[in-house]
Amino acid sequence: KVIDVSEFGSKSAVLLGIVAYLAILTGGYLGKWDKELKNPYLFLLPDSPAKKMWYATVMEHVKAAIDGAILVLPLGIAWKVHPFHIVSCWLIYVFLQAIKLYTKVLIDSFLRNSLGETVKQLVRLGVQGGIIGIGVLLAVVAVVLQNFNFAFFVILIYGMIMAVVIGLLTVSRFAIMEQYD
């Protein structure tokens, strides 16, 4: 028998909460992609820094999409969640992972080796928490002004915009290898 989550509220809201919890609090997810930044071959590619960034991070996005599907699809189907909410939760998971990934690059680029790893992790958690906190605030406003379905749409669009903006802020990191040694 599938766990009945209806006592906790909307099944869609519970699914979104699980997605957010796992995306935010699973710290070991990012893997070893940042070794790409130390690989000189990435910087020798005759391409723009934006494409180099994409080449270095694309597999992490694919991994996030697969992990999100493995997480969201079985729960959403078992709980009979509306397909719009299932797809939205899946994409929100992918965008949250992209925000985590690009925030790590951005914070590491700004702080370089000036602070220890613990301080960099705390700064990164603070920045990620602020970004996600704004998203939660926007979702609450969307629920108050419209309805719960609109909140999913708002979170989805906000996550996409933030992933792109933070990604664009990290592009300079992929220009030349020596800039952050």
Regions from the PLM with identified roles:
Residues 1-39, 49-181:
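Hydrophobic alpha-helical transmembrane segments of membrane proteins
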